[in-house]
Every structure is written in C-alpha cells, then in structure tokens.
Amino acid sequence: ECLYAQAEKKLEEIAFDEYSEVLFISKSVGTIIASAYAEKYKIKCCQILYTPLEQTFMFEHDDAIAFIGTADPWSDVKKVIACSKNQAVPIYVYEDANHSLEKENILQNIDILKNVMEKTQKYLR
C-alpha cells in the first residue's frame, strides 16, 4: 500500500488523457502497482511486465507483454503463466532464470538479456 501511495503521488499531476500513447514498464511488485493504477484511473496503456507476480493479474491487461524465469523464487511461476495466458498476455519464459532473469552463467545471462530486449523492441513497434 505504501509503494502504491508513493506511485500515485508521483503520477497525480500527469494528465494521461492528453497523450495518444501511454506505456508502463514495470518489474516485480511494480507490475502490481502499475496494473492497479492503470485500472483505477482507467488509463488505456501498453504494459511491459518484467517478472510479474501472481497478484499482477488481479487487474485486466488489454495490451501487455510479460517475461518470467522458471526459477523465480518470488513468483508462483505456473500460476503467473496461467494467469497471463488467461488474459491473452504473451509471456516469455526463461528456463532456470531467477527473479532477475539471470542464471549462474554470465554468457547465458547476456543471451537472455538480448532476447528480452529483442522481444521488448518488437512489442514496441
């Protein structure tokens, strides 16, 4: 609640209806905050959800993309994947990657980062 209140205070002066496009990029608990805010204020926006939590999907997503690792200790990965698919949100799953989308091997981390950024770029086009 405290984090949500902080975000709400920071965003209160923005007239979102004056913009033709709005993009929320969030990670972890921030995915819950961004999703809740967008729903509460009826902001038509695109969302990039990096390592979302299950609670993120308590809110509807009309235009979003998500990324998660199967070794994410902060998420119930199977539930997140199911919720994402239930809302028709494309979700990219990285085998054995943690909450930072990292593994033990740095070269694999670079490959994951490259893949995530390529998919993010494609989504933004």
List where the protein language model places each region.
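Gly/Ala-rich beta-loop-alpha elbow adjacent to hydrolase catalytic centers
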Residues: 24-35
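Catalytic histidine-centered segment of alpha/beta-hydrolase-like enzymes
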Residues: 97-112
